[in-house]
Amino acid sequence: MPIQPLSWVSIFRLGTVQLCLGAIVVLMTSTLNRLMVVELMLPAVLPGALVAFHYGIQITRPNWGYRSDTCGNRTRWIIGGMGMLAVGALMAALAIPLLEASFWTGLGVSVVAYGLIGMGVGASGTSLLALMATATAERRRPAAASITWLMMIFGIAVTAITVGQVLDPYSHERMLAIVAVVTGGAFLVTCLAIWGIERRAGVQAAPVAEPMRFMDGLREIWAERAARNFTLFVFLSMTAYFMQELIMEPFAGLVFQMTPGQTTSMSGAQNGGVFLGMVLVGVAATGLRLGALRSWVVAGCLGSAATLAGITLIASAGLKPLLVPAVITLGFFNGMFAVAAIGAMMQLAGQGRARREGTRMGLWGAAQAIAAGFGGLTGAALVDLLRNAMDTGAAFGMTFVLQGALFVAAALVAIRIMDGRATAQARVVPGE
């Protein structure tokens, strides 16, 4: 059966699945993280280690992608992964009151929960992106990548803002009810959105009778220079991107005495800024063909670094009214940087050896996950360490400065490996 490229409606349906992923994950990385640090007064390194563990589990992403390449059905991996993610998120929420009542019991439940979250995101997210790379017409891949990522950011922002509005006055019971509604709704919407797309597109191939061993397939992909260079770029840039993920809400709570609802809403506003940055680049670079994608990613990285320096100054001067606008600006520049990298990833996934789209997406997803875990844990650990030597505001500020330096380094790497021509499609130079 010949492949029928995805229609725009099908692309938006797949984007809805990405939206559901973001809606669940944001509860773990922002709301639950803040509750551990501020309400339960636990060290920031604890939620940092749990989130790093969930990212570490995602080192299995290449394996999930390879399985979906060879089993002939990506839909079941998408739905099954979303189910694991929903169950893990519910367990993570249940662990909050358990941590307060019995620390070790709560910690044990948290470890299992974050492990399920990592496996769910890896199985569902990798298979979803592989399906898109396989079934989307080449000319639509950059736009499809932008649409699905924007929908994920939209889901993150709307969930964070809405949860922030209904979470106050805070209670464990209210928090558990909110998480149950979000996770149950996300799983149901995913099943409805994905159903039938793979079969109608004609990409539900027969399973490979004698598939190559996973490690042999992974070595084939690593031998491709473009894939290898892009993996290194993803790791560095995502380390910078995720360093503030676990500390921004505690920063607002500890330095500016913001409530859980206020900091959750701030997180949603930041992701709203990411959304706007992605829209700008999508319209300017793809629609109007203004500037090269390399220029956009460099501008995003350097803008992020400058904004982090500004947030440090805001903290030292105690200018609370400027905090949320600065955080939105940081999100805006983050979005500029991210959308170009996503376009390049979608283009490269379909190049090279056939029936390896899932493995390539898994490789880059694993690099992103490792970097995210490393960056998040490093940010949290630095804050804990520096708070022993200086006041809280200065400790957060020093961490933000280091994150800004990594963004500058990522910009320099992008200049070396990305094509500087003004084009609507991202291209990575397969050399240095």
Predicted regions and their residues:
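Short amphipathic helix-loop junctions that connect adjacent transmembrane helices
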Residues: 30-45, 246-263, 384
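Helix-to-loop junctions at the C-terminal end of transmembrane segments
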Residues: 59-73, 167, 277-293
